[in-house]
Each structure stands twice: as C-alpha cells, then as structure tokens.
C-alpha cells in the first residue's frame, strides 16, 4: 500500500532542476535578431546597384565610357581640379581612336560633359564598395551577422571587386585599334554580372525578411513545378538581358526600325556576311536584333504558360506574384517594340533597361513565393 501524502507537502524537490544556460545562446539569439539590420543594409546596396545600372546605361548612351583612359581605383576618386589637370585628361582622350575617328574637333567643354558621366559612374562604384565594406566588416566585428551568412555576404564584395575589374577590361577594348566603342561582348559580360549581383542581393533580402523557422516550415509546402517554371523564366530573362547588351553595344536597335517585320521580311538582310560565321551572332546588327526579338517572344510565351500553371496554386500570394510577372513581361515587350519603332532614343532605351531590372526582381519574387509559400487563412489573412 502506497504511503499517503499531505496536500500541503512540499513539491520543490520533485521538480526537475533548471538546466544551466548554454554558453553562446544569447549571442546566437542576438545574431539571429540582427537579420533586420543586415536586411536594411542590403536594401541600401540594392538601391545603389539599381542606380548604378541606370547610370551605366546613360554613360553608354551619351558615349562617355571611353572618356577616362586610365584605371586608377584610388587616385581616380579625385577629379581634375585645375586647367592643367583637364588639359592632361583631354590629351589622353585625343590619343584614342574614338576621338580621332569620331569626335575630332571636340571642345574641352564637350569633353568635360562626357568625362563627368564616366567619372560619376566610377565614383558610384567606389561608393558601393565602401558601403559594402563598412557594413560587412561592421557586422563581422560586432558579431551581428546571422549564422550561415558570413560567406554569402562576403561573396557580394568579391563579385563587386570582380565587376570593377571587368569594367576596366571592357573600357580597355575601346582604347586601341579602330574601335569607336567598347567590345559588345565585354559590355554584355559587365551588364550580366551587374544583374547577377542585383538578383543575389534581392534574393538575400527576401530570405532575411522571414524567420529561419518560417522558411523551413514553408518549404515543406513549396510548389516544385512553379519553382522550375520560374527557373526557366530566370534563364530566358538572363539570355535576353545579354542579348539586349549586345544590341546596345553595336547600336543594333537603330538598324531595323519596323515591326513586326524587319525591312519588310521576317529575317534581316545579309545576316551571314561576317567571317568566321560565329561573329554574326555578336557583331551583325540585324542578326543580333533578330535574336533579341525572338528570345523576347519566347520569354513572353513561357511566362504566360507558367502564369497559367500558377492559377492552380492554393496560395493567393503565389498567384499574385506570377500575375505581376505576366504583367511586366507583356509591358517589356511593348516597351521594346516602342523603342525599336522610335530608333532607340535614350529615353526609351533607358526605360527598357529599367524594365529589365523590374522583370528580374518580379521573377525572383515569384520564385521565392513558389518555394516558400505564405499560408493564408480562409478569410485571406496571412497566417
């Protein structure tokens, strides 16, 4: 027979002893709580990269990219401050083919206009590098980087440095020989990496916008089919951006200014004249514009198919994300057609390039929603 216990009996001895706090738990919690601060810093970088892409486009459209003929990452931060400094820079520019074959007779004032565009473009690159360095090393020293994110954030700095080197590699292609502009394939490399960096930052911002545990739970209900569709859209959009850079690099947008045909035919004229034949895909204005058109049509068709598939999703936010993808793809096609019909003036051209930025971001957002759906209640409120 068991021994009776008083209802007033002390029970403290029967309770389990409290476990000691594990070292580092508070530190890990603080680092997890820093996701918001890191996210704000990434938003700053995102905005700067968007501006950088726009300034880079305007630098190209104003034919300013070859106005600075030296690569001085540190000393170049200080612009010419005296008449002697300006005379030296102008003399360097007058020694390259662009001046001798295209801009001979340019005044100092005209040179200063294009110089400031290129200097501003490079200076903005320095600002982006500084913002990255201050943020990354500041978070690193104060141990505010969320677990698992040090390598990802460091990668952004590495890619930024690589982008600067590619930028000079691009400029160097137009300083010798008979080149009047930078090599179009180098321009495509430079712009392509800029969009890759932008997309990476955008993805990081979205991931840090939700707690890690929420992401792990949401991934269980992810929609693999829509993720695959978004991957196809990302790939096609990347190809289209590179083709757009080739179009811009050789002014192919002004070669054929009719639509839907090209000089009255489906195919451009004399499209295989260059030797070896592969050069036509990069240097023949007609073929480059034709390829840009065809991939644009394909991107829209695939986008509409993926949008149609997204109608079956049980998640409202996922469907809305793909709605916006369909809208921007259609809008970009219309904007591209208007740009061609107007012989690619700088206003329409820069708007079309900005549309590409929005397109990439909306496709990434749709992919994120498909991979990490947001659950909603029956009333439509986010759960």
Swiss-Prot record:
Protein name, entry field: Heme A synthase
Localisation: Cell membrane
Keyword match Metal-binding: yes
Family: Belongs to the COX15/CtaA family. Type 2 subfamily.
Binding site for heme: 292, 352
HAMAP family associated with the record: HemeA_synth_type2
Gene Ontology CC terms: plasma membrane
Entries under InterPro entries matching the protein: COX15/CtaA_fam, HemA_synt_rhodobact, HemeA_Synthase_type2
Subunit structure, as described in the record: Interacts with CtaB.
